[in-house]
């Protein structure tokens, strides 16, 4: 899986789960925890409000919704 696909999948996973650890994410995506930290930072830099609780995991801040995406035929 390339990085773009993984970051989008990570966002969707965070959207469907309450809390998830970096370790479980690294196991799920078969990458290092360091890679997960970089992917989380990428999402945060894109404006996604990700919260973190030490020893508990990552989560999307309450009330965040994925923005709608529109495609054209062009």
Residue positions per predicted region:
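Short, basic/aromatic recognition patches that contact phosphate-bearing ligands
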Residues: 1-74
